[in-house]
């Protein structure tokens, strides 16, 4: 059997992102999203669960965009002089305090559960989970809160060894230059048996998105492809079952 999780990253980043994710669920093949709990529109998750009853909500652990949920003095090694997360986590987290990383990750998890939506899994913004200072905390929290996780090529081996439930395949090539209908159809044709996740970033591009993200206009194209009738028909005709991470329950 071929099970497919089409996940819309970055829920909460802007209203346009949220709207694009909802549109891709209602009129397309998206069945999962992940919430940036430190972003201004994360709370909208609780408002859309009624109109998106089969949408799974994950936690998009974020350590390099926006501000932390904790007071800056509690996570001082993670933030700059203005209280924002430092950019470029691959370098900045090398000097970060592990305990501060832990309390911020757990605060984001607690925020997600407070939203009153079905929390199905954990993943991370820019793949921060794979950082050597983060991965063990990420796994420990997945175990503590009984959550499956997205595994990337950089961390799949250690996640599998931990026993945490995860996907069989992760596709991250429907992004940037790969955002073409032909590429998505190619990905779908090559799907293997098991559970595959395709990472996506659909949105309606608004002024705020242009201001806060360098990955912007391609999100609009992603949304149009995810709701394209040819894509929807291909999924139906090829016995691909659309699911979210609740399949692990």
Curated annotation (Swiss-Prot):
Role of this protein: Probably catalyzes the deacetylation of acetylated carbohydrates an important step in the degradation of oligosaccharides.
Q: What class of enzyme is it?
A: hydrolase
Q: What is the lineage of its organism?
A: Bacteria, Bacillati, Bacillota, Clostridia, Thermoanaerobacterales
Task: Name the species this protein comes from.
Answer: Caldanaerobacter subterraneus subsp. tengcongensis (strain DSM 15242 / JCM 11007 / NBRC 100824 / MB4)
Q: Keywords in alphabetical order, please.
A: Carbohydrate metabolism, Hydrolase, Magnesium, Metal-binding
Cofactor(s) in the UniProt record: Mg(2+)
What GO terms in the biological process aspect are recorded for it? polysaccharide catabolic process
Question: What name has this protein been given in UniProt?
Answer: Carbohydrate deacetylase
UniProt cross-references to SUPFAM superfamilies, sorted A to Z: Glycoside hydrolase/deacetylase (SSF88713)
